[in-house]
């Protein structure tokens, strides 16, 4: 049996989750749309802060701070299960969508926060999917540029105080 993950309240986590066998599930607009809508639904259900995200063809990146007392594992379990359910429904499939575990790393300070923000933003550029971060529509960079609400842009006015580690 796996050891239960322990998380620290009030801290941002850089979360990465891969698709099963790195299948390019989110390669097309429908796949990315399913992921983003499910992420919006998860945000409404669990009330977490989302500083950044990026939906890549074979994986996702999140920079997320669960609300106090919330369990990041439950958030990720729900997010991955709902995405798989919606994907399978729209594709008439029963396949496993996600790989086994997600990776979650606490963000320790403001310089690391800035590094993770940039790392997530640059992911589609490094993969050759976009010339600039804000050109990738399934990303926090695009959402911030266009004032879309999924990303909590108010966090950037008070960035140093949101990181408590």
Label the model's feature ranges:
Residues 1-58, 65-165:
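Short Pro-Cys-Gly-centered "Cys-loop" motif that presents a nucleophilic cysteine in a tight turn
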């Amino acid at each position: 049996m796996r050891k239960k993950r322990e998380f620290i309240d009030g801290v941002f986590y850089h979360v990465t989750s891969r698709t099963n066998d790195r299948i390019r599930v989110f390669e097309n607009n429908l796949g990315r749309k399913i992921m983003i809508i499910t992420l919006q639904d998860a945000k409404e259900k669990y009330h977490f802060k989302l500083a950044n995200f990026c939906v890549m063809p074979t994986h996702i990146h999140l920079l997320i701070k669960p609300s106090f007392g919330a369990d990041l594992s439950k958030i990720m379990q729900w997010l991955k299960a709902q995405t798989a359910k919606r994907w399978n429904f729209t594709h008439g499939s029963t396949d496993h969508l996600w790989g086994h575990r997600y990776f979650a790393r606490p963000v320790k300070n403001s310089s690391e926060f800035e590094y993770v923000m940039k790392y997530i933003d640059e992911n589609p550029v490094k993969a050759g999917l976009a010339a600039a971060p804000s050109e990738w529509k399934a990303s926090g960079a695009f959402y911030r540029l266009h004032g879309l609400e999924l990303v909590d842009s108010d966090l950037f006015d008070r960035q140093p105080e949101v990181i408590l580690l």
